[in-house]
């Protein structure tokens, strides 16, 4: 489990460092690298930290873009990610 978490954090950090984690959405700055603080909640099912909830709120407008991106989709659409978002009191958007 810890190895999987480490791989997730490393993968997101590498993509973000290469500029691949930044996606523009209607003036919003979408950066999947900001969600690395949520790795424990998303990959491991841990309770999201305050920093995680803050990052999720900041990236809320980007959820659909991340969900459609093959690099992040399986994490964003996972039951643990949905649980983390819900625990932070954030409504999941309906993506088209």
Swiss-Prot record:
Residues 1-27 form the signal peptide. Keywords: Disulfide bond, Lipid-binding, Signal, Transport. The keyword Transcription does not apply. InterPro entries: Bifun_inhib/LTP/seed_sf, Bifunc_inhib/LTP/seed_store, nsLTP2. Disulfide bonds join 30-62, 38-52, 53-88, 64-95. GO terms for biological process: lipid transport. Pfam families: Tryp_alpha_amyl (PF00234). GO terms for molecular function: lipid binding. The keyword 4Fe-4S does not apply. Belongs to the plant LTP family. B11E subfamily. Transfer lipids across membranes. May play a role in plant defense or in the biosynthesis of cuticle layers. This is Non-specific lipid-transfer protein 2.
């Amino acid at each position: 489990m810890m190895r999987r978490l480490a791989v997730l954090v490393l993968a997101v950090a590498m993509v973000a460092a290469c500029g691949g984690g930044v996606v523009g959405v209607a003036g919003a700055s979408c950066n999947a690298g900001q969600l690395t603080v949520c790795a424990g909640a998303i990959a491991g099912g841990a309770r999201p930290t305050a920093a995680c909830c803050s990052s999720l709120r900041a990236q809320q407008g980007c959820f659909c873009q991340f969900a459609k991106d093959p690099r992040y989709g399986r994490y964003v659409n996972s039951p643990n990610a949905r649980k983390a978002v819900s625990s932070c009191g954030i409504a999941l958007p309906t993506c088209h």
